[in-house]
Amino acid sequence: MELVIGTKAWSTWSMRPWLALKKTGAPFTETLIELRQENNMSAAAIKPHSGSGLVPALKDGDLTICDSLAICEHLAERFPGSELWPRDAAARALARSAACEMHSGFSSLRSECPMDLNAPVRVADLPEPTAKDLRRIAELWNDLLDRFGGPWLGGAEWGIADAFFTPVATRLRTYGVRLSDFGDKGLGEQYAERLLERPEFLAWQAGA
């Protein structure tokens, strides 16, 4: 397998399936394309690998799969023993719901607090739409951690939902955000710390 990704310091969408693929333990080749190059060179470099013209893209045999969530779903089917989705049906349904909410939502947090793993820690002056996103994240994390007992959103096993929220944890750190200011009951901040201690994330960060 070959996973085509963008700049590790910035590309949240590349990070998510990379973390999931690392958890499976399957061997893969990483093709890194530097983003934000001048003269549209990044797009030109991506296009031969990805029909969508976007990263990430996973090449698995004669398949090329674009989009981070589609890649993660493929990995969950390809490596069922890795438990990328919870075994329990209720936990699996809500973990999927959380991952999809992250996939399609929280646009203000994305725009106001872009991921940059090499940026110094700084406190951001957050507008109300971003605060609303953070309140929802705190609520979602606390609900799932309380319901399934943690330490991960679906229970005992780290999985796709956790991969999808790992970039959020980096944003909290980079921008000096305390989830307790947005309704966190204590579970969310601890969870964010655990995400940033995962060996998969530490390996990604080391390459940034």
Where do the language-model regions lie?
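GST-like domain detector, emphasizing the conserved glutathione-binding G-site
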Residues: 1-127
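GST-like fold's C-terminal all-alpha helical module
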Residues: 102, 106-197
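Exported/periplasmic ABC-transporter solute-binding proteins
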Residues: 207-208
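Exposed, tryptophan/tyrosine-rich binding patches on extracellular proteins
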Residues: 204
